[in-house]
């Protein structure tokens, strides 16, 4: 199975958390149907990724080999465009990455309820979901940051969902993820 990849890079800070100084592989997938239909997220900075034919079509096995050659760090963030525009391919990619023991963060402009309704299979294979359209009017700047994990979102309307033992927990307002690894935390949970 092939997936349309725009680029891959080693990134820190914006790609999410990792125990390796927050350095993760960031995989950019091509295609955003919403933008191509004339409704991009206002202020989207990834317009080169809107074209579903952009980048290159690659076998998923080759993509995984490429990622493993980049680093022995097993932390990856999948962004776009809109990754879920390639839903069957993303399910297969995340499934195989999870089999290789990767920690996976997926960004999508869909809300968690939309993902559950139309894209639920991908939730079985990811560790965190960042949901919601980027909103330039609610953009978060470095000067706005507070301690915790909020630096991984681009605008304040986006939510961070953590897969805690098969339940997705809204951890957007958390300062520390340790309680979720240890079984605590009193945030909104969504059972799959």
In which residue ranges do the predicted regions lie?
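N-terminal [4Fe-4S]-dependent radical SAM core
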Residues: 1-53, 184-185, 190
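Charged phosphate-binding loop/patch that engages nucleotide di/tri-phosphates or the phosphate backbone
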Residues: 159-192
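Flexible loop residues that form catalytic
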Residues: 49, 81, 133-134
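Structural preference for beta-strand elements that scaffold enzyme active sites
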Residues: 24-26, 75-77, 103-105, 128
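Conserved glycine-rich "GG(E/T)P / GGGxP" loop and the immediately following alpha-helix
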Residues: 73-97, 141-154, 159-168
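Canonical radical SAM enzyme core domain
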Residues: 50-65, 84-123, 128
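Conserved alpha-helical substructure of the radical SAM core
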Residues: 39-76
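Non-cysteine beta-strand/loop elements that form the S-adenosyl-L-methionine
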Residues: 127-136
